[in-house]
């Protein structure tokens, strides 16, 4: 390893970046798990799966709202984030997933079969696709929020 590479120290571009990157996976996992429990409910008709979906969607929305706030702060504060890196695509996909899941939460409050089949499951599928698309934008640019300084002499 060359000397210049060994001396580089990664620095976070802003204070909200680590918060967002820690919070972002939680709603994605909750939304995917809600889709899985919707599929389980449609296959078994056990009311337990409907209640699992409700709780997973609620948890995803609560943590997702915190992540969305951190993303908005970072997005508005950093021109580099808006023009490159994550960009508008990530923002639209993540906020879209949250909006779809908000509607899905209201649909899931209906008791019984109609809460999931077909509307609730359709909304869960759409939200899962949007959330996975937002995850995909993170890997498009692998070092979005990390900047390297030149070594001090």
Regions found by a protein language model. Give the residues of each.
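Transmembrane alpha-helix entry/boundary detector in multi-pass membrane proteins
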Residues: 16-24, 42-63, 86-90
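Cytosolic juxtamembrane helix and N-cap/initiation of the first transmembrane helix
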Residues: 1-28
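Hydrophobic residues within the alpha-helical transmembrane core of Major Facilitator Superfamily
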Residues: 32, 39, 69-72, 102, ...
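Membrane-helix boundary connector in multi-pass membrane proteins
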Residues: 102-122
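Loop-to-transmembrane helix junctions at the membrane interface
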Residues: 73-95
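Membrane-water interface at the C-terminal end of transmembrane alpha helices
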Residues: 129-146
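Canonical alpha-helical transmembrane segments
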Residues: 63-77
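Short, highly charged, low-complexity non-transmembrane loops/tails of multi-pass membrane proteins
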Residues: 145-153
